[in-house]
Amino acid sequence: MPLSQEEKQRIINEFKTHETDTGSPEVQIALLTHRINELTEHLRVHKKDHHSRRGLLKMVGQRRALLVYLNKISPERYAKLIDRLNIRTVIR
């Protein structure tokens, strides 16, 4: 299920780095994390929904790439974001 406009705006306002920010890595990762969490709950109920499972794996890969990028440009922002989102670190 897609994010409602209000829910998306709430996430953007919570994670934006400046007033007109909509595309920073933090915002993109937060939006992906929300969608991943919703899709994970959907897949717990609908175990045979393989199309959604593939979409979930693509989103996880995209989020991972953004997290690697964020860690490369600013390890402090990366550490703060994974704490706020309560996700595991992807950098070893």
UniProtKB/Swiss-Prot annotation:
HAMAP family: Ribosomal_uS15_B. GO terms for biological process: translation. InterPro entries: Ribosomal_uS15, Ribosomal_uS15_bac-type, uS15_NS1_RNA-bd_sf. Keywords: Ribonucleoprotein, Ribosomal protein, RNA-binding, rRNA-binding. GO terms for molecular function: rRNA binding; structural constituent of ribosome. SMART domains: Ribosomal_S15. Part of the 30S ribosomal subunit. Forms a bridge to the 50S subunit in the 70S ribosome, contacting the 23S rRNA. The keyword Disulfide bond does not apply. Belongs to the universal ribosomal protein uS15 family. SUPFAM superfamilies: S15/NS1 RNA-binding domain. One of its GO terms (cellular component) is cytosolic small ribosomal subunit. Pfam families: Ribosomal_S15. It comes from the Bacteria. This is Small ribosomal subunit protein uS15. The keyword ATP-binding does not apply. One of the primary rRNA binding proteins, it binds directly to 16S rRNA where it helps nucleate assembly of the platform of the 30S subunit by binding and bridging several RNA helices of the 16S rRNA. NCBIfam families: S15_bact. PROSITE patterns: RIBOSOMAL_S15.
